[in-house]
C-alpha cells in the first residue's frame, strides 16, 4: 500500500508517502497552507504543487495513494475540510480513502498514536483539543481578542502592560520595564504605535522577556507567568475531565513548551494527574498514522521506528 500523510500550517506544507510498515518512501515540503491566513484558492494551489513535487518521477502504483489524510491549519472552520477533501478527491479519483481535517488531529497522533488524549498548543496563540470517543472538541483557542490564554500573545501583553503600569505609576516597579525597553530600543510609552502596527505577533515577541525575568526572580514577572500558566492549565483540565485515563495524556505543541520554566509552571498547576508528552516526530507522522488507520493498516511501535529511521530530514 501507499499511504500519504500531509501536514499544512502557517510556514510550510509537509507531505510523505509511506508503505504500510511506516517506511518513508518520499518526503517533500511546500509553501504555507493555513486556511485561516490565506484564501482557499492559494491553499489548494499549494497542495497541488506540493503533491506534484512529491510524485515527480513516480508512475503507476507508486504514484497512486491508497489513503490520504491532510491535516491543515484552519481546516476545522466552516466547510474548509470538505473543500480540501474534494480537491484531493479530484486529483485522485481512484483513491478510496481521503480525509481532511484540522492539523490538531495529526499533531495529537504524532505524540499519542492511539486512544483518547488531548493536545495543548502554546505558541503565538493557544488552544486545547481533546479527542474522546472518536470525536474531537476544541477548548479555547478563540483568537487573541477572545481567548488564547497562556499563549505567547498573552505573556507578551502581560509583560508590556506591567511595564506601562510601572511607567505610569499605576503598578509596582519591575525589571520588565527595562527588559521590554531594551528589546524595543526606546521607552515603552514611545512604542505604542509600533506595537499596534505589529499586531499579535509583535506582542507575542515579548513572551520570552516575561519568562526570562520570571526565571530570574522578578516578583511581578513570576506572578504574571503563573497566572498565564494557570489559564492554559485550566483549558487542559477542562479537556482532562472528558478523559477516562490515568494519568491523563496531553501532547504539547508550540514554541512556548520549549521553555523549561513555563512548562514547569503549567505542570505544577496541573499536578501529577496529567502527563505532558512532547512529540519526538513531526506532525506529518500523525497524518500518516491517521491515513494508515483509514486504510486498515496496523500502527505499532515497529511502525513508528520504521518511520523514524527512514524519515529524510
Name the predicted role of every residue range:
Residues 52-92, 97-99, 109-112:
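Short beta-strand-loop/turn "lid" adjacent to the catalytic site in phosphate-handling enzymes
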Residues 96-119, 135:
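Conserved phosphate-binding catalytic cores of ATP/NTP-utilizing and phosphoryl-transfer enzymes
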Residues 115-166, 170:
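Glycine-rich phosphate-binding loop of actin/hexokinase-like ATP-binding domains
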Residues 11, 73-75, 124-127:
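Short glycine-rich anion-binding loops that position phosphate/pyrophosphate groups of nucleotides
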Residues 7, 103, 123:
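Active-site glycine-centered loops adjacent to acidic/histidine catalytic or metal-binding residues
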Residues 1-65, 90, 111-118, 160-313:
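ATP-binding/phosphotransfer module of carbohydrate and carboxylate kinases, centering on a glycine-rich
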Residues 92-103, 147, 278:
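Short, acidic/small-residue loops that bind anionic groups at enzyme active sites
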Residues 107, 127-128, 283-285:
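Short gly/pro/ser/thr-enriched loop/turn and capping motifs at secondary-structure boundaries
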